[in-house]
Amino acid sequence: MISLKRIFCTCCLLLSVWAVFAQGPSKWKALEKPLNFYLANDLGRNGYYDQKPIAELMGQMAENVDIEAVVAAGDVHHFEGVRSVNDPLWMTNYELVYSHPELMIPWYPILGNHEYRGNTQAVLDYSQVSARWEMPARYYTKVLENDDITVRLVMIDTAPLLDKYRKDTEKYPDACKQDMDKQLAWLDSVLTSAKEDWVLVVGHHPIYADTDKNDSERLDMEKRVDSILRKHNNVNMYLCGHIHNFQHIRKAGSKIYGA
């Protein structure tokens, strides 16, 4: 079994990023492992609330550490999603913010609840506009490989799995249109066949969290997603966003780490 230390996941969250910043470029190189990627979520702030300086820091760090990709775990666009691939928010939330040359690498995004307040198909269609925005479907899987290490990313679409969003058709019109059972069957199938060194499932909503957000979200995630993850001994981590802070959780009786 490969040590967890051999995979380096940098979470783009305010406290953890500024902790890395305090170390300085002279120490960043020592953090490099055979396969490195950023996990970034809940980004879309039009450059405000420290989004722009953190984006610049991500670029500076990538000058010293070989970053393979950015895994974007939803809510790239606050607060009402986007209306089309030509929506100005693509510039102010994304292109003009993450403009450092070292961030011109593959981005693997999923939808968050805020994208579901807009045109979700436009988020997928942006893959035809931007060479780095690689989102082939609402849920999909991607394998990263380097130096004989393989990591399977299993990217899931969590808003349609939660009754809160499915029932609120006025605010989240696309959520109820998605086939929940089909996605869950797909997730089970992908995990059954996954043979990589590391299997990381990525969704926007947490399964377990210390938060004042609606308990029903996590109860639905526990019932529908965690029940599948626990069936498979090859799942190492569940990575998510939504709660706007950093938590590292392992539920009693589970071998899966959540962050």
Which residues fall in each region the model found?
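Active-site metal-binding loops of divalent metal-dependent hydrolases
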Residues: 40-45, 74-76, 113-114, 158-159, ...
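Bacterial Sec-dependent N-terminal signal peptides
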Residues: 1-23
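Extended active-site neighborhood of metal-dependent phosphoesterases/phosphodiesterases
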Residues: 31, 78-199, 213-237, 243-259
